From Swiss-Prot:
Any one biological process term the GO annotation gives: tRNA wobble guanine modification
Keywords assigned by UniProt, alphabetized: Cytoplasm, Queuosine biosynthesis, S-adenosyl-L-methionine, Transferase
EC numbers, comma separated: 2.4.99.17
Protein name: S-adenosylmethionine:tRNA ribosyltransferase-isomerase
Gene label: queA
Protein source organism: Hydrogenovibrio crunogenus (strain DSM 25203 / XCL-2)
Pathway the protein contributes to: tRNA modification; tRNA-queuosine biosynthesis
Gene Ontology MF terms in the entry: S-adenosylmethionine:tRNA ribosyltransferase-isomerase activity
Length: 351
């Protein structure tokens, strides 16, 4: 398939610049298995979750990964941390008039120092330190001084509210530079109501990198090279899904990152069945993919020609997906990270 097959017209006014007043006040477009669509509100998801289903959430925590500083020569720099390597080192994008060389010293947020150790492709390996507080780790320095890394299509400066709202209520493991946005719609009350219905909640971890916003640049999507991200699927999550299957329940992935975790872990196992996994994945899910774990997907609305709309098409079917997106535009759903959600049921064989 061609990249252009996944293009659609999106009025700029539909790109959400702020979150809804309350997490659950978003709208929900349901793609039903019979091919129809239903316009709902997010709390209506309760009526689509059955007893014995399990919802799999990504518990990554967004770090305030955007940092501003200057070179010793006075030139301005902007860092977007891609990955925390250890207690001192990070991999980061650096924006400046001239790329800093190995050994270059930077002063960050007028608070601590950074030294460029080397380069790995488009990324820089950088060591962070604070002379007056040498015990502080790189992550602690980032947490104390960084800015929330809002996506490029949110055209405003980050605000105090974003530290809470660009984060899921169940976030636990720091490391993402972008939120797993399907989870932003849940508050603790809704999670309790889902459990009260007899559905279970499980967790995986995928630290979303800035590569999630990288556009597909090749025409033939089979030639696209997917970015790599760190994931973890724990034994207790594998066991939960096994029990769900035994009870006749469905696996509902909350977000494309949860899909990529589960399908990667199954793909990497010897027999193609879900197994615990910790490592990296560059799985690229496109139409024609045979899903091994996920039955239903909850996701936000994605960018035209993005790898994420391709993933949705793989589960929902290409024509159904593009029709649903056209419906969402017509009905003025809000798009992207702070926008509305869609619940995707794959089509039945006769729909």
């Amino acid at each position: 398939m061609r990249r252009q097959d996944f293009n659609f017209e999106l009025p700029e006014a539909l790109i959400a610049q702020q979150p809804a007043k309350e997490r659950t006040q978003s709208r929900l477009l349901v793609m039903n298995a019979d091919g129809s669509v239903s316009d709902c509100h997010f709390p209506d998801i309760l009526s689509y979750v059955n007893e014995n289903d399990c919802l799999i959430f990504n518990n990554t925590k967004v770090i305030p990964a955007r940092l501003f500083g200057q070179k010793l020569t006075g030139g301005k720099v902007e860092l977007l941390i891609e990955r925390v390597l250890d207690e001192r080192r990070v991999l980061t994008h650096i924006r400046s008039s001239n790329a800093p060389k190995s050994g270059a010293k930077l002063r960050i947020e007028e608070a601590f120092d950074a030294e460029v150790l080397g380069r790995e492709g488009a990324l820089f390996e950088v060591q962070l330190s604070k002379d007056e507080a040498p015990e502080l780790t790189a992550l602690e320095l980032i947490e104390a001084h960084g800015h929330m890394p809002l996506p490029p299509y949110i055209e405003r400066e980050d605000q105090l509210e974003d530290k809470e709202r660009y984060q899921t209520v169940y976030s636990e493991k720091p490391g993402a530079v972008a939120a797993p946005t399907a989870g932003l719609h849940f508050d603790n009350d809704l999670l309790d109501k889902i459990k009260a219905k007899g559905a279970a909640a499980g967790f995986v971890t995928l630290h979303v990198g800035a590569g999630t916003f990288k556009p597909v640049q090749v025409d033939d999507i089979s030639e696209h090279v997917m970015h790599s991200e760190v994931i973890e699927v724990l034994p207790e999550t594998v066991e939960l899904i096994k029990q769900t299957r035994q009870k006749g329940g469905r696996v509902i992935a909350v977000g494309t990152t949860s899909v990529r975790c589960l399908e990667s872990a199954a793909s990497f196992s010897e027999n193609g069945e879900l197994a615990p996994y910790q490592g990296e994945t560059d799985i690229f899910i496109t139409p024609g993919y045979d899903f091994k774990v996920v039955d239903v997907l909850l996701t936000n609305f994605h960018l035209p020609e993005s790898t994420l709309i391709m993933l949705v098409s793989a589960l929902a079917g290409y024509d159904r997906t593009m029709q649903a997106y056209a419906h969402a535009v017509e009905q003025k759903y809000r798009f992207f990270s702070y926008g509305d959600a869609m619940l995707v049921h794959p089509p039945t064989s006769d729909s």
